[in-house]
Regions:
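Glycine-rich, mobile lid/loop segments that gate access to catalytic sites or pores
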Residues: 1-41
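Acyl-CoA/ACP chain-elongation machinery
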Residues: 7, 11-21, 83-88, 126-131, ...
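Phosphate/pyrophosphate-binding loops at sites that engage ATP/ADP/AMP, CoA/4′-phosphopantetheine
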Residues: 67, 102-117, 194
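Stable alpha-helical structural segments in soluble proteins, enriched in small hydrophobic residues
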Residues: 97, 101-110, 130-138, 182, ...
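Short glycine/threonine-rich loop-to-helix capping motif typified by GTGT followed
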Residues: 87-91, 124-147, 176, 213-221
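A short beta-alpha structural unit
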Residues: 78-81, 119-128, 168
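Condensing-enzyme catalytic core mediating Claisen C-C bond formation in acyl metabolism
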Residues: 4-5, 37-104, 152-166, 198-204, ...
Length: 227
């Protein structure tokens, strides 16, 4: 039922975001559970759409950021890593590139416990089960415990660590812009400009992008205060 719960959480989150491409305010666990099977165990309503859209992020100097009429998001740390898509012994569920990408960003940001030091995360989750998988991969949850965070409601809107309050990739997947949208949504959160899907008190946020056979990873940590 974990995947079903993730799908419900993200689609309900999307109802607060006017830019989300799927709005299903009446979605239920039963509706997800009974939707057509794509490939076991992923069902239709646990998968992302394919849609059109765009995204832009303006990165400036500190001087120009301070002159802006609205508060900036300060970049605390960044990471990029790539690995070969297929090789003997590769762990596609917990890829090394994802681990090292996150570790690099956390080092730069001075984060030692992302699960408690980050307030909200926008993760690249095209299928429901990627939520607990990426939480473990980038250090938001201990190994084999990501599912528990979902089950206990910690990743829902209003939970201890909300994941994808925008509705995420499950609610809008404009190919080519999807990853950058995660970065932009993280920035909106720490700027206090996320509208109805704003997480109260969000001071630090993660934006995470992924591509290929889970082999390309990018992550940034942004904050409301200058690092």
């Amino acid at each position: 039922h974990i995947g079903w719960q993730v799908a419900v959480n993200h689609r309900l989150n999307a109802t607060r975001n006017p830019y989300a491409h799927i709005h299903k305010p009446d979605i239920t666990i039963e509706e997800v559970r009974s939707s057509p099977m794509l490939w076991d165990p992923i069902r239709f309503l646990e998968s992302c759409p394919s849609s059109d859209g765009s995204c832009a992020v303006v990165i400036s100097s500190e001087m120009h950021a301070r002159l802006a009429p609205r508060p900036p998001a300060w970049i605390h740390g960044t990471g990029w890593r790539t690995e070969t898509g297929h090789f003997a012994g590769r762990d596609e569920v917990n890829p090394r590139a994802g681990q090292e990408c996150a570790a690099a960003a956390y080092r730069e940001a001075g984060i030692t416990d992302p699960g408690t030091e980050v307030d909200v995360s926008e993760l690249y989750i095209p299928y429901s089960w990627y939520e607990p998988m990426w939480m473990e991969n980038i250090g938001l949850a201990p190994e084999s415990s990501g599912w528990r965070a979902v089950d206990e409601g910690h990743t829902a809107f209003g939970g201890r660590h909300p994941i994808n309050p925008s509705g995420g990739v499950l609610s809008g997947n404009p190919t080519g812009a999807t990853g950058l949208l995660r970065f932009a949504e993280a920035a909106l959160q720490v700027r206090g400009l996320a509208g109805e899907h704003q997480v109260d008190g969000a001071r630090r946020a993660i934006g995470h992008a992924m591509g290929g056979a889970s082999q390309f990873h990018a992550l940034w940590v942004v904050g409301s205060e200058k690092p």
